[in-house]
Amino acid sequence: MAAPPAPAAKGSPQPEPHAPEPGPGSAKRGREDSRAGRLSFCTKVCYGIGGVPNQIASSATAFYLQLFLLDIAQIPAAQVSLVLFGGKVSGAAADPVAGFFINRSQRTGSGRLMPWVLGCTPFIALAYFFLWFLPPFTSLRGLWYTTFYCLFQALATFFQVPYTALTMLLTPCPRERDSATAYRMTVEMAGTLMGATVHGLIVSGAHRPHRCEATATPGPVTVSPNAAHLYCIAAAVVVVTYPVCISLLCLGVKERPDPSAPASGPGLSFLAGLSLTTRHPPYLKLVISFLFISAAVQVEQSYLVLFCTHASQLHDHVQGLVLTVLVSAVLSTPLWEWVLQRFGKKTSAFGIFAMVPFAILLAAVPTAPVAYVVAFVSGVSIAVSLLLPWSMLPDVVDDFQLQHRHGPGLETIFYSSYVFFTKLSGACALGISTLSLEFSGYKAGVCKQAEEVVVTLKVLIGAVPTCMILAGLCILMVGSTPKTPSRDASSRLSLRRRTSYSLA
């Protein structure tokens, strides 16, 4: 991250590259830096709105893509496993590639990161639409959905890496960055709630129980053309949000210039920067812990709808349960931001544990009242699991910058490699879990699944997320976590960044 120099009168001498001595002048400069680093309410909201389309699309795919591929496209579970695994791996592989090219890109009139966000938008929208399109042929549907899911995940990565790294270039103030992150998470979740509501209401007619009651055949149910059209309409609604939200992002957010860009001296290569970041102990602990936690959340989301449809009598409550998860996540995000500021980030991590007993309860007692309680608690836990890593990453970057003489640009490597590892873990978790459905005898399009499939879904909704969350929290709790830099440390960090080398 690059921090702008503190305001000074014309002709004043430039600061020397050493820590300023404490005193009245230092305190005054600290207050001026704090005021200069403040972000307006409009900027924070517009920054959050920019991430809404990707979150809407990700939420729709998380809750409904697996069900769509199995029951509407009627692809065998083994092929669905390959589609999900290939798409996630494609998105994961795109992260270091995105970090490499973004760090080598030159600053333009709109910044260094913003052009990547703008350039990816139309292609993401097209890939997302065709992901939900049912082609007329049947033999190559697996290849069709693998292609477009891989394209969507890769393009979404090239959008998300610069968008999330933009947090470090909004302001030099750590507290304001945390606030911008909270605004982003809240606005994104509100958009996700709206998108999931619209998507779910549109496609609900494709999964009604009368679809099975109307036929006496034990084999797969014929897919109605109306069901495929409903998914296309839902996809088109999501596609429209991309140009609208990105326009607001460009109008309301200004990327700060990088004052160390013209600094002399050799640059740091991408591979050298990646080697440095992946050997930083606080970063390693953060990444490994959230490998398990994020994979648990993805498994819970992916199998909730399938569990309600095939392993319990909750198919009439699917929309209500999804909305409960998202509403509780949206409402609890501001509360978790207050907890982060008041009690610290490590303490807030215990909120993720709340999902564990309730996930087991849902698998054991799959009734409607229990399901709604579990959905509410899961939403609260998901909120903190999403907010916490993005709030801790800037502190990890600052901790790294205080220990190493390397300038701005490395923040993109931190963000891209974090997303790479979490996506890779999600790919493995979803791929293996979906393959387990194939081994248990899941039949695409069949109304009543075998008892082995029901047991497998209960394990996937209860035991698997529980083990992953416990493992992730144990790793996160070991050792100390980076603290928010003090005022003097922030001043030293700002001086070091202004006198250090930039990333080549």
Swiss-Prot record:
Composition skew (Basic residues), residue ranges: 494-504
InterPro entries: MFS_2 (IPR039672), MFS_trans_sf (IPR036259)
Mutagenesis / variant outcome for changing residue 95 to A: Abolishes export of sphingosine-1-phosphate
Sequence segments annotated as region (Disordered): 1-33, 483-504
GO biological process assignments: carbohydrate transport; lipid transport; positive regulation of platelet aggregation; sphingolipid biosynthetic process; sphingosine-1-phosphate receptor signaling pathway; transmembrane transport
A UniProt-annotated Pfam family: MFS_2
GO molecular function: sphingolipid transporter activity; symporter activity
Membrane topology listed for this record: Multi-pass membrane protein
Annotated Gene3D superfamilies: MFS general substrate transporter like domains
Keyword rRNA-binding: no
Subcellular location: Cell membrane
Listed Pro residues bias regions: 14-23
Result, substituting residue 423 to A: Does not affect export of sphingosine-1-phosphate
Domain of life, source organism: Eukaryota
Membership in a protein family: Belongs to the major facilitator superfamily.
Name of protein: Sphingosine-1-phosphate transporter MFSD2B
Organism: Homo sapiens (Human)
